[in-house]
Amino acid sequence: ADGIFAIDQFTKVLLNYTGHITWNPPAIFKSYCEIIVTYFPFDEQNCSMKLGTRTYDGTVVAIYPEGPRPDLSNYMQSGEWALKDYRGFWHSVNYSCCLDTPYLDITYHFILLRLPLYFIVNVIIPC
């Protein structure tokens, strides 16, 4: 989120009759991925993004993915990369500081396949 972590607008929450609360804060997350260029421009990259809270533990806040795959309804295709596969995994971790307290996160893995046409036409063929 560009290093700005404050949400500067009020957002509503959904409250279920069971007491379950859903909050969807407006945010755009940006991440980076270490690129391995051994097979460039015919490479694929495995990038991950971990979402969780370190402020509240798993006894206070429960987070769960809606399904095994993230929602890509706002995904925009790229001319350089194709999304080959993507998955989300739920984790409960007990750190050495507090072994009886679980901390929850969801880690999303994205496998990106480089589309090599640009590099073939502009870099490889002219050589």
From Swiss-Prot:
Disulfide bridge positions per record: 33-47, 97-98
Glycosylation sites: 46, 94
Membrane topology classification: Multi-pass membrane protein
Compartments where located: Postsynaptic cell membrane; Cell membrane
Cellular compartments per GO CC: postsynaptic membrane
Pfam families registered for this protein in UniProt: Neur_chan_LBD
Keyword Transport in record: yes
InterPro entries per UniProt: Neur_chan_lig-bd, Neur_chan_lig-bd_sf, Neur_channel, Neurotransmitter_ion_chnl_CS
TM helices/strands, residue ranges: none
UniProt keyword terms in alphabetical order: Cell membrane, Disulfide bond, Glycoprotein, Ion channel, Ion transport, Ligand-gated ion channel, Membrane, Postsynaptic cell membrane, Receptor, Synapse, Transport
Record's catalysed reaction(s): K(+)(in) = K(+)(out); Na(+)(in) = Na(+)(out)
Extracellular-facing ranges: 1-127
First-listed, main subcellular location of the protein, grouped into a coarse class: membrane
Molecular function per GO: extracellular ligand-gated monoatomic ion channel activity; transmembrane signaling receptor activity
Subunit note: One of the alpha chains that assemble within the acetylcholine receptor, a pentamer of two alpha chains, a beta, a delta, and a gamma or epsilon chains.
Family, per entry: Belongs to the ligand-gated ion channel (TC 1.A.9) family. Acetylcholine receptor (TC 1.A.9.1) subfamily. Alpha-1/CHRNA1 sub-subfamily.
Purpose of the protein: Upon acetylcholine binding, the AChR responds by an extensive change in conformation that affects all subunits and leads to opening of an ion-conducting channel across the plasma membrane. Does not bind alpha-bungarotoxin.
Name of the protein in question: Acetylcholine receptor subunit alpha
Organism: Natrix tessellata (Dice snake)
Origin organism lineage: Eukaryota, Metazoa, Chordata, Craniata, Vertebrata
Gene, per the UniProt record: CHRNA1
